[in-house]
Amino acid sequence: MTKWTLSVVLCGLLVASVSLQAHHSLAGVYALGKEAKVTGAFKAFRLVNPHSTMKIDVKNKDGSLVEWTFVGGSVQQISRLGLKEGPNALKPGDEITVTIVPALDGKSPVGLLSAITYADGHTVRFRSPDE
């Protein structure tokens, strides 16, 4: 009975550790509590769960383009906000300003998507500013 109980406990711990390993912490990648704005031309969404990504081209001071990638919400959230089809749909080339939580290193062209502001001034929020 003791061997069986020990086996069950060890299996449970193994399963739990795999689950915990699979989930990630935002604090290890993004500078939580900080905010940045990036303006550029929309390129595309990659709609996959659990986190979609959005890419924009940003022009540097020297005129060269840098592709930025932002992690956003789920496919359902993107659809619900009408970003793929609907009132807030983005088309390649649309000029937008993206509010993000920047990368922890402060240099990488990546961020956690907080909001998109369109050329006409309206904003779509993914998360509240204090999250």
Model-derived regions: residue spans:
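Bacterial N-terminal signal peptides
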Residues: 7-19
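Short boundary/loop segments of OB/S1/cold-shock single-stranded nucleic-acid-binding domains
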Residues: 21-36
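Conserved hydrophobic positions within beta-strands
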Residues: 38-42
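Short aromatic-glycine-enriched beta-strand elements
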Residues: 48-59
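A short macromolecule-binding patch
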Residues: 61-74
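Short, structured beta-strand/loop micro-motifs enriched in basic residues and often containing a Trp
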Residues: 73-81
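Short nucleic-acid-contacting surface segments enriched for D/E, G, S/T with interspersed K/R
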Residues: 80-98
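OB-fold/S1-family single-stranded nucleic acid-binding modules
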Residues: 101-128
